[in-house]
């Protein structure tokens, strides 16, 4: 009888070892929050291989993996119904997640999204050649840059989605250019690959008395607009990804009133009139 009970106990123990990842629940695991509004279950105990089991559910797909650490970091993988493969990489400090979708071969990327703890993210989609065809960069404040129809030379269409309005333009290998037009005036906001912003204004008005010119101050991120040698207004492109406008007095010598945040595209156009 004792041998029988010992045999049953051994079988149950082996079954428990084989279950590993598939048997995680709230009793034998800890849930860890991750960037991107995800969470991962981490086993409280090590498995038979001396590692901690991990389970995460992404878009209703269960991903499984193991890790030497019990803090939730590691690599998890799964396979979709269409046989495409999904890989979730969680950084050691839990500050970043990388979600990748591959074709059936497990090598050709379909999409990739990197999300940080501050809620900023970069999402990319790839064409049949494995080249980036679409890209969305979301900042921590929720504003974002959207790129579509990206070609092999790095060119494409661009949008900057700000609070209340959208700027549209183009992408090149060197920079993003977002344009606002009003009458004869064209305002161009340039964003370099490193994220540095510069703004310029071009006016095709042939009359010197009404033609607008502008000077950009990179130190204060301010575009000062001048008409007939008099300053008329300042447009400030803030680090918080907002734009403010403030008027100069009639002599064009000093600012008056307070800077007002622009919340509509028409307000930018009015500032260019």
Curated annotation (Swiss-Prot):
KW Membrane (keyword) present: yes
Subcellular location: Cell outer membrane; Cell surface
Sorted UniProt keywords: Cell outer membrane, Lipoprotein, Membrane, Palmitate, Plasmid, Signal
Presence of keyword Membrane: yes
InterPro entries xrefs: OM_lipoprot_Borrelia (IPR001809), OM_lipoprot_dom_sf (IPR023322)
Residues linked to a lipid group, S-diacylglycerol cysteine type: 17
GO CC list: cell outer membrane; cell surface
Membrane topology: Lipid-anchor
The protein, known as: Outer surface protein A
Gene name linked to the record: ospA
One Pfam family here: Lipoprotein_1
Signal peptide start and end residues: 1-16
Organism this protein belongs to: Borreliella burgdorferi (strain N40)
Lipidation, N-palmitoyl cysteine type: 17
Source taxonomy: Bacteria, Pseudomonadati, Spirochaetota, Spirochaetia, Spirochaetales
Disulfide bond sites: none
Family the UniProt entry places it in: Belongs to the OspA lipoprotein family.
Chain segments annotated as transmembrane: none
Main location: membrane
């Amino acid at each position: 009888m004792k041998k029988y009970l010992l045999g049953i106990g051994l079988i149950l123990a082996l079954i428990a070892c084989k279950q590993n990842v598939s048997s995680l629940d709230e009793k034998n695991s800890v849930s860890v929050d991750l960037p991107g509004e995800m969470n991962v279950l981490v086993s409280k105990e090590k498995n038979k291989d001396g590692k901690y089991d991990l389970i995460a559910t992404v878009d209703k797909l269960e991903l499984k993996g193991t890790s030497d650490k019990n803090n939730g970091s590691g690599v998890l993988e799964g396979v979709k119904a269409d046989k495409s493969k999904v890989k979730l990489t969680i950084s050691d400090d839990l500050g970043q997640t990388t979600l990748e979708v591959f074709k059936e071969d497990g090598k050709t990327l379909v999409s990739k999204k990197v999300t940080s703890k501050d809620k900023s993210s970069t999402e990319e989609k790839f064409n049949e050649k494995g080249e980036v065809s679409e890209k969305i960069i979301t900042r921590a404040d929720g504003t974002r840059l959207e790129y579509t129809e990206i070609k092999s030379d790095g060119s494409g269409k661009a949008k900057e989605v700000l609070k209340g309005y959208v700027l549209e333009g183009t992408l090149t290998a060197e920079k993003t250019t977002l344009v606002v037009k009003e009458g004869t005036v064209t305002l161009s906001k340039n964003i370099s690959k490193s994220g540095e912003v510069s703004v310029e204004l071009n006016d095709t008005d042939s009359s010197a008395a009404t033609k607008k010119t502008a000077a950009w101050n990179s130190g204060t991120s301010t575009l000062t607009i001048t008409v007939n040698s008099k300053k008329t207004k300042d447009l400030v492109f803030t680090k918080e990804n907002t734009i403010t406008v403030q008027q100069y007095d009639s002599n064009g010598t000093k600012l008056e009133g307070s800077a007002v945040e622009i919340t509509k595209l028409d307000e930018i156009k009015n500032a260019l009139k």
